[in-house]
Amino acid sequence: MTTSSVATLGHSSELDGSRLSPHFTLGELCKTSAKTPDGNIPSHVHIENLKRLCGWLEVLRKRYNERYVMNRRDPSATLGMTKGVLSSRAKSRDLSRAALGRDDKEEPIVINSGYRSPAVNKAVGGVATSNHLTGCAADIRVTGMEQLIRYAAILLDYADETGEEFDELLLEKNRSGAFWLHFAVKPKGNRHKVLFISV
């Protein structure tokens, strides 16, 4: 995608097909429920930041699936089911995945919020210094505390192994009990900030 084509995009559906990495699209990282006149369209600089962030998200997706999805024990032993019952349930699951266009058994990483324009950031109550404004941050959906901790551990291990820097890894929980992982990587000046936060 060229810089000039980014400037002409005006709707999130037009962003959906633009790939930032093998498993993440520009549409995923720019989606918002906030209705603003600017359409939440990132600049070419923001897109480069999102690509850098997606490099980490690809590592997270790959390692999480290798460790916790693809190498699970035989579920029939754990669930006390006969293999026939489990097999019919697995077939049903596979058919529904196929209907969604998924040809693998891997679990996706789901992004709640990525890039935010100033108008979107204001509409959702984001802080003025948010890494979302520059395309350097993503809020990642998790199913609960266990997945939150596993995601955080994978990203911390990757940083330790490679020496790659990140800015923020925030394990967040709101008043209603929902968890998510806020993760940010800047082009430079990363702080390696790790916190548990209640919002």
Regions found by a protein language model. Give the residues of each.
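Extracytoplasmic cell-surface/polysaccharide-interacting catalytic and binding patches
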Residues: 1-65, 192-199
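Serine/threonine-rich, low-complexity intrinsically disordered segments
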Residues: 4-5, 10, 27, 72, ...
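Extended, low-complexity, intrinsically disordered C-terminal regulatory tails
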Residues: 54, 58-67, 107-125
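N-terminal cationic-hydrophobic initiation segments that often serve targeting/anchoring roles
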Residues: 61-65, 100, 156-160
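Short glycine-rich, low-complexity/disordered patches
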Residues: 64-72, 105-109, 164-173
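A cross-taxon signal for low-complexity, glycine/charged-rich
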Residues: 73, 79-84, 91-106
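Active-site microenvironments of hydrolase-like enzyme catalytic domains
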Residues: 124-140
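Catalytic cores and adjacent binding grooves of peptidoglycan-active enzymes
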Residues: 134, 142-199
